[in-house]
C-alpha cells in the first residue's frame, strides 16, 4: 500500500471517531497535510470545478496540499486565467465537469460552481470515487441535501461543506453544538435566524451570451431564459433560481 492510501485510511478512521468533526476543516485538512508531505509522485491530485472568485480561492488553498491537475468552468476565460495562475498552465482545462470525474488520477474535487449545480456535481463526483469539498450554500432545497447525505453514506467518500464559520472562529460554533447536544441548556424550544436582503433592480437588458460562456449549460435545471449579464457570475446569488 502506498503512503497516500495509508494517509487516507488514517483520516477515515479518525473521522469515524470524531463524529461531526469528520466533515469539518479541522479533520479534513490533516488528511491533506499528511499527503502533502509525500514525494511528488505520491501527492494527491485534484480537480477544481467552478473557478470564479470563491472557487479559485478554494482551489488555491487546496493546491498547497495537493496538485491541481484539472480546471473546469463554463467560462473559458476563467479556465485560462486560473490554469495560468494556479497551475502554471500545466493543468488540463475542461468545460464539461464529467470529463474531470472520468479521470482516475484525481482523488478529490473542489466545487465552486453556481449553487444550483452543486447537488448534481457533488453526487456524481462521489459516485465516481472522488472525495468532495463543496462551497456553501450546499443545496437549494432540503431534499437535495438529503440526496447528498444518502450518497455520502453509500459511497463512504469524504465530504466537506465550505461553511468556514462552523470550523473556524476559535471553535465557538463547535463548542455551542457540544453544549446543546449535552443538554446543558435544556431542550431548545425556538430558534430565530435572520437573512439579509439582496439588491433589487431591473428590467435588465437581454443580449447574446458572450462567446466564452456556455449559457445553456450554465442554466442547468433552471428555467431557460435569455442571457442578461446581471444573472451571471457573481450576481447569480441574487436570483432564487440559482441560489438561496
Residue ranges and their predicted role:
Residues 18-87, 165-168:
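N-terminal Rossmann-like dinucleotide-binding module
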Residues 1-20:
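N-terminal secretory signal peptides and thylakoid transit peptides that target proteins
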Residues 56-58, 79-81, 98-99, 119-124, ...:
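Pocket-flanking alpha-helical
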Residues 91-96:
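Conserved SAM-binding strand-loop segment of SAM-dependent methyltransferases
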Residues 114, 119-167, 183:
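Beta-strand-loop-alpha-helix segment that lines the small-molecule cofactor/substrate pocket
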Residues 50-54, 154-244:
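Predominantly a Rossmann-like dinucleotide-binding segment in NAD(P)-dependent oxidoreductases
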Residues 109-110:
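N-terminal Rossmann-like NAD(P) cofactor-binding module of classical short-chain dehydrogenase/reductase
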Amino acid at each position: 500500500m502506498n503512503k497516500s492510501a495509508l494517509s487516507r485510511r488514517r483520516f477515515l478512521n479518525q473521522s469515524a471517531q470524531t463524529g461531526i468533526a469528520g466533515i469539518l476543516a479541522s479533520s479534513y485538512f490533516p488528511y491533506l497535510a499528511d499527503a502533502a508531505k509525500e514525494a511528488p509522485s505520491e501527492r494527491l491530485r485534484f480537480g477544481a470545478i467552478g473557478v470564479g472568485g470563491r472557487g479559485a480561492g478554494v482551489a488555491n488553498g487546496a493546491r498547497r496540499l495537493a496538485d491541481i491537475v484539472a480546471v473546469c468552468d463554463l467560462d473559458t476565460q476563467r479556465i485560462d486565467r486560473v490554469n495560468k495562475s494556479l497551475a502554471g498552465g500545466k493543468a488540463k482545462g475542461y468545460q464539461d465537469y464529467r470529463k474531470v470525474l472520468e479521470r482516475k488520477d484525481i482523488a478529490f474535487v473542489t466545487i465552486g460552481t453556481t449553487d444550483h449545480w452543486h447537488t448534481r456535481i457533488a453526487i456524481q463526483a462521489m459516485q465516481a470515487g472522488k472525495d468532495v469539498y463543496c462551497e456553501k450554500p450546499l443545496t437549494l432545497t432540503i431534499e437535495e441535501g438529503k440526496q447528498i447525505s444518502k450518497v455520502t453514506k453509500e459511497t463512504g467518500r469524504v465530504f466537506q461543506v465550505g461553511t468556514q464559520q462552523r470550523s473556524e472562529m476559535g471553535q465557538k460554533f463547535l463548542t455551542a453544538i457540544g453544549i446543546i447536544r449535552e443538554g446543558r441548556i435544556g431542550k431548545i424550544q425556538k430558534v430565530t435566524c435572520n437573512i439579509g436582503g439582496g439588491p433589487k433592480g431591473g428590467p435588465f437588458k437581454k443580449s447574446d451570451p458572450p462567446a466564452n460562456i456556455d449559457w445553456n449549460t450554465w442554466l442547468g435545471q433552471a428555467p431557460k431564459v435569455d442571457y442578461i449579464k446581471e444573472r451571471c457570475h457573481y450576481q447569480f446569488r441574487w436570483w432564487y433560481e440559482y441560489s438561496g
